[in-house]
Amino acid sequence: MRLVKTVAELRDAIAAFRRAGKTIGFVPTMGFLHIGHLTLVARAKAENDATVVSIFVNPLQFGANEDLARYPRDLARDSALLQEAGVDILFAPDVTEMYPRPIQTVVDVPELGSQLEGAVRPGHFAGVTTVVTKLFNLVQPDAAYFGEKDYQQVTLVRRMVEDLAQPVRVIPVATVREADGLACSSRNVYLSPEQRAAAVIVPHALDEAERLYAEGVDDPAAIEAAIEKFIAAEPLASPEVVAVRDPDTLAPVASLQAGPVLVALFVRFGSTRLLDNRVIGREKTAEQEAAQ
């Protein structure tokens, strides 16, 4: 594996792949890798000739009072994991390499990005789509791989790629979970032992939503209220977003029985926010069945 820290060196490496006629699979990350990231890497390796992973904690997607400074970082650990996974290029720039001057050009998907997580983290998704666009420009991947845990992010990136005619396929990969059902996340490391034990309320709430749907509950507001109450019964959990939405547009829906719906959760444990989601009413893929 080649560790690359500059844009110039990355461009040279990508040009060499292209001269050799190789397809490129790309996994953008913020580091502190877990099995979910490595699952994305494995998929990229299986479907492409060369695999590029980026590690960059992007300041544009953090708000003023968020966890940019304390976001977990361990490049040596991550490099070892990616070396073992057979990655070809690890691109790990610092902030001045990615943003040598204050950035004035922002890529925004405002309608999709202002809902759900975007409603409690204003500006977050504009930071995401801006850095993803820049990374796509640098890596020039044939395919890019994103975890479905960040469902809204995948939806925004897909729409951005469509609107801007970016020549990359966006591949969503089923959420990878811990043994007790909690979605794998770099932020899980923030949780105290008590909070970690309590955090299983999040996937359990998705199970409860699916149960209510199976029983024929049709009113989205009733589902939202029931799930918010279900989560709030855990003293350490504070639900910030509980929403039933259209899985393609993220718009509110009038009925649960008209078609598949997305149940999106954003739950705080102390200063740590965890997100999770599930599309219910749609036949699951074999990959999604295995992940759950």
From Swiss-Prot:
The protein's Enzyme Commission number: 6.3.2.1
SUPFAM superfamilies: Nucleotidylyl transferase (SSF52374)
Binding site for (R)-pantoate: 61, 153
Entry binding sites for beta-alanine: 61
Known partners and oligomeric status: Homodimer.
Pathway it works in: Cofactor biosynthesis; (R)-pantothenate biosynthesis; (R)-pantothenate from (R)-pantoate and beta-alanine: step 1/1
Functional summary from the UniProt entry: Catalyzes the condensation of pantoate with beta-alanine in an ATP-dependent reaction via a pantoyl-adenylate intermediate.
Main location (coarse class): cytoplasm
Active site: 37 (proton donor)
One Gene Ontology term, aspect cellular component: cytosol
Pfam families in alphabetical order: Pantoate_ligase
One MF annotation (Gene Ontology) recorded for this entry: ATP binding
Family: Belongs to the pantothenate synthetase family.
Native organism: Agrobacterium fabrum (strain C58 / ATCC 33970) (Agrobacterium tumefaciens (strain C58))
Domain of life: Bacteria
Protein name per the record: Pantothenate synthetase
CDD domains (UniProt xref): PanC
Cellular compartment(s): Cytoplasm
Parts of the chain that traverse the membrane: none
Binding residues annotated for ATP, in chain numbering: 30-37, 147-150, 176, 184-187
GO-annotated biological processes: pantothenate biosynthetic process
Catalytic function, reaction form: (R)-pantoate + beta-alanine + ATP = (R)-pantothenate + AMP + diphosphate + H(+)
Keywords of the record: ATP-binding, Cytoplasm, Ligase, Nucleotide-binding, Pantothenate biosynthesis
Additional remark text: The reaction proceeds by a bi uni uni bi ping pong mechanism.
